Amino acid sequence: MNALLTPDYGLIFWTIVNFLLLVFLLGKFAWKPIIGALEARENKISQDKKDAQEARDEAQKIKAELDVRLSNISKEAQEKLAQVEALAKQQKDAMIKDAQASSERMIATAKEEIEAQKNQALKEVKKEIADMAVEAAAKIAGVKTDPKTDAALVDNIVKDIINKA
């Protein structure tokens, strides 16, 4: 066990020579490909980061444009809705106005018809009253009178009846 703790200068010399030879061979054949691979990997990672940042920036730009478009579309929709509501209100008001005018015309026409029927009924009643009055007067008096006198008498009677009513 003592031999392991005691340094052997020959062994140390050959270990150093082997180590230096290993370093030389690694440097000559392995370090360049390893460093090249590491640099390539580093460049790829750097490029991927740059591409990701550009993609993120582009996405944010597109999002901002879409937000502006959405805002504009929303404003246009609100304006269209307001226009449609205004048009609907105008049409409703026009329909109400037309309906009122139509009902007023119908009422006026009905009043005219009622007045015409009333006048016609009054004429008929006046004629019947006149005929009855002439017949009654002729029966009471037992005399036949002329049509002018009959008409004047009937007019007076009808006027009296209308004034009393």
Curated annotation (Swiss-Prot):
Where in or outside the cell it occurs: the entry states: Cell membrane
Offer a single GO CC term for the protein. Answer: proton-transporting ATP synthase complex
- Keyword Thylakoid attributed: no
Which InterPro entries does the protein's record reference?
Answer: ATP_synth_B-like_membr_sf (IPR028987), ATP_synth_b/b'su_bac/chlpt (IPR002146), ATP_synth_F0_bsu_bac (IPR005864), ATP_synthase_B_chain (IPR050059)
Q: Which UniProt keywords apply?
A: ATP synthesis, Cell membrane, CF(0), Hydrogen ion transport, Ion transport, Membrane, Transmembrane, Transmembrane helix, Transport
Annotated Pfam families: ATP-synt_B
Give a yes or no for keyword Amino-acid biosynthesis in this entry.
no
Gene Ontology molecular function terms on file: proton-transporting ATP synthase activity, rotational mechanism; proton-transporting ATPase activity, rotational mechanism
Its transmembrane ranges are: 11-31
- Membrane topology reported for the UniProt record: Single-pass membrane protein
Purpose of the protein: F(1)F(0) ATP synthase produces ATP from ADP in the presence of a proton or sodium gradient. F-type ATPases consist of two structural domains, F(1) containing the extramembraneous catalytic core and F(0) containing the membrane proton channel, linked together by a central stalk and a peripheral stalk. During catalysis, ATP synthesis in the catalytic domain of F(1) is coupled via a rotary mechanism of the central stalk subunits to proton translocation.
Q: Which family does it belong to?
A: Belongs to the ATPase B chain family.
Xref: HAMAP family: ATP_synth_b_bprime
| Subunit-structure text | F-type ATPases have 2 components, F(1) - the catalytic core - and F(0) - the membrane proton channel. F(1) has five subunits: alpha(3), beta(3), gamma(1), delta(1), epsilon(1). F(0) has three main subunits: a(1), b(2) and c(10-14). The alpha and beta chains form an alternating ring which encloses part of the gamma chain. F(1) is attached to F(0) by a central stalk formed by the gamma and epsilon chains, while a peripheral stalk is formed by the delta and b chains.
What is the protein's given name? ATP synthase subunit b
UniProt organism field: Elusimicrobium minutum (strain Pei191)
